Amino acid sequence: MEPATAPRPDMAPELTPEEEQATKQFLEEINKWTVQYNVSPLSWNVAVKFLMARKFDVLRAVELFHCYRETRRKEGIVKLKPHEEPLRSEILSGKFTILNVRDPTGASIALFTARLHHPHKSAQHVVLQALFYLLDRAVDSFETQRNGLVFIYDMCGSNYANFELDLGKKVLNLLKGAFPARLKKVLIVGAPIWFRVPYSIISLLLKDKVRERIQILKTSEVTQHLPRECLPENLGGYVKIDLATWNFQFLPQVNGHPDPFDEIILSSLPPALDWDSVHVPGPHAMTIQELVDYVNTRQKRGIYEEYEDIRRENPVGTFHCSMSPGNLEKNRYGDVPCLDQTRVKLTKRSGHTQTDYINASFMDGYKQKNAYIGTQGPLENTYRDFWLMVWEQKVLVIVMTTRFEEGGRRKCGQYWPLEKDSRIRFGFLTVTNLGVENMNHYKKTTLEIHNTEERQKRQVTHFQFLSWPDYGVPSSAASLIDFLRVVRNQQSMAVGNLGARSKGQCPEPPIVVHCSAGIGRTGTFCSLDICLAQLEELGTLNVFQTVSRMRTQRAFSIQTPEQYYFCYKAILEFAEREGMVPSGHSLLAMDGQ
């Protein structure tokens, strides 16, 4: 089925021949995607909106389309019902509105009144829904599409209780790269002294071009940037606004016409199964040749800077359970907690004083929910918890990427029997060593777990990777790539022995992966596994996206820029070995930088 290109409607905005041609190209590209996901083709007018925002640069407009779609999906901005609560009250709060005047260039003027925002009263996702809804009403106008948007952030009369750093970051990210509007400038008016610190944090996330458009002004300075005819009275202008009633005009007669993006957002991922993964192909995936060119362009310093962009992002979620006084002794490192939202919960048992806490997180793999459990190297006081987790999660494979000691420091406890036929008892679980195989770069141990309460036995394969240096990263990824393949094969074979599971009737049990803290080498191993799986299936991958999404599940995954750079290096090394690029060609990008 070939993608259909939407015809130019009679009421479409007037475009130049070049702009019309760009619109046709954009629709051809996007509608390949809509056909793939079996959704309605994008309309001509919607296409023009995205192209206007990027001055009819087709590639940049396609990127914007996917950023907009992904942002709406991520923030739950779908099937909006402005006449229903809580969205109706948020729209009518007046904290955000579109003025009924334009600046001298014809740009629309959006106004956010900070003193009306009370984070403890308004759910952040509802605030974002209202913001999207009202901005969409503004850019329905061809004049706004053509002439852009001025955003005023009015902080007059506000205090710290009205400010929400995470919301501010999301709004700026939206305006700079995820909404179809030309952002002309952002005027921050009447900012208190305390605002300098959070603004310095936010500004680090912005490109220079966007940062140049942001100006922090005193109230008396606003008229130097916009005439009084364009400003509300409280900012020295002539525009009368009753914030309590002004936004009534933006409510539709009924809940409005269906939003074409609802279908696109809801259908852009596979059906919502219980085991959907965050690691699915995204819009910015690179081919292997594009990756080579990208690394050559960015060089080592640029890749390190890319990691810093990831590192600066605040963790998504909370750490209440990890930081609970009763659980602190179960954390190997005080600064490596695990997220409440993805933590593995142990079953509490009668007669035992244990909590359900272990420093371990469920992590998705490529197109597989909970493919891994990322965890710290077990402590003596958590051995029993570790094996209980392995039993309860029906784990078949354990991957250890550290030694017991490195650089004279203890990295992990000896939580399994090392010698053949030896056994260790952990409560009602007894672990027996059935045999050890010593390879060049790793050790493979077959273990049997006997649950004396349930009178059941299971086999688990334990791999210990031995070729990671005490400091830094391996000079070559060859041994790790080989090791990864061995682990994959063992998991596939073990799952196949389970019968029904191998036919996809229920999700595979996770692979337990740990190092010492459970974030550095663990994150590197899992990132490489995900990227190579996508590369082998589709011929594309995105390291930045993979690591960013991974950190939403196992916070702080990949600890250093060196480990992040190693992921790129390992992928290129793999591609060269597999003949995806000419021998020696890809690694030229990695040398001497």
Swiss-Prot record:
One of its GO terms (cellular component) is cytoplasm. Its main location: cytoplasm. Residues 303-574 form the Tyrosine-protein phosphatase domain. It catalyses: O-phospho-L-tyrosyl-[protein] + H2O = L-tyrosyl-[protein] + phosphate. Keywords: Acetylation, Cytoplasm, Hydrolase, Protein phosphatase. Transmembrane segments: none annotated. The active site is at C515 (phosphocysteine intermediate). It is found in: Cytoplasm. Its EC number is 3.1.3.48. InterPro entries: CRAL-TRIO_dom, CRAL-TRIO_dom_sf, CRAL/TRIO_N_dom_sf, Prot-tyrosine_phosphatase-like, Protein-Tyr_Phosphatase, PTP_cat, Tyr_Pase_AS, Tyr_Pase_cat. The modification N-acetylmethionine is found at M1. This is Tyrosine-protein phosphatase non-receptor type 9.
